[in-house]
Amino acid sequence: MLSHAEFTSFDSRSLSNAEDVFVFDLAALVPGTCCQIDHDFAVYLRTFANSRPCYLLTSVTYNELMARLPTSVRKAFRGVFASSGAELWSGDEVVERVEHTFSDDLYEYLVKVVQNSAYPAKDAPLIENGPATLRVCLAGTKASIGQLGTYLNWENEHRELPVIVNELQSKFPDHDVHQDSDTSLLVTPVTMSTLRVHRRIASEHANARVISCMSPRSANGFAGPFCNALSGSDLVTEVGGPSDLSQLMSYEMRRKATDDLLAAE
């Protein structure tokens, strides 16, 4: 597990009475494209989120999120930032949505990119349009787990996605381009980055300490602007998956139980 902060530093705060707000990344909760959350871990996560302010951040659409997390887990979060923060959901209801119209030049270039890809088993549609995001998956945005597995094996051998990401970022510097999963890349305008998520949480939780638990790819990719905006006693912890998160949550629950006992004396 890679961390910007020490694993056991949840209790090393500059403001002893500060509220802790947790922000989780979907890729850290459910590693693997199209996978569903482990049942036992889902119960543990729901218990944790019901007892403290927790948010979820993901680059995927809310419809895809619904297929990967059960209703009880989704509703345990104080809010869900979907489509790289372009949407805020609460209780399966959209609270806020910002939209962006991408240029014809960008669309045309993306069409050429997918047409020129050497991958032989492309299955349209290959481009998914979110409220302020464009996702490209050469296996197909509606590909089955089997199709994604076949494409992933091909991509691991040919390493085509990093080349496409670099080309797009160079061609369209006013957009952020990241490989947001093993099988897809994400395009967002720089004016609609996940910095919006930080501002929204800061406005809802003044003086709170934000503890962010992210997969390395997300922390260094689409969620980078959010993570970079954290400062002071805030923490960014890169986790390898549910096992790492379970340890972190267990530690936090024990720490809070100890604090509550001391406060009651």
PLM region spans:
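Metal-dependent phosphoesterase signature
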Residues: 13-36, 94-98, 102, 116, ...
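Short loop/turn segments at strand-loop or loop-helix junctions that form parts
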Residues: 22-27, 82-86, 130-131, 136-141
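Short His-Asn-centered micro-motif
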Residues: 24-25, 57-60, 213-216
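Mg2+-dependent phosphoryl-transfer enzymes with acidic/Ser/Thr/Gly-rich catalytic loops
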Residues: 4, 15-17, 186-265
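Non-catalytic pre-domain segments flanking phosphatase-related domains
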Residues: 1-26, 37-43, 72, 261-264
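Active-site phosphate-binding/coordination module
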Residues: 34-126
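Conserved acidic, metal-coordinating active-site core of Asp-based
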Residues: 121-212, 218-221
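A general structural motif
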Residues: 17-19, 51, 77, 131, ...
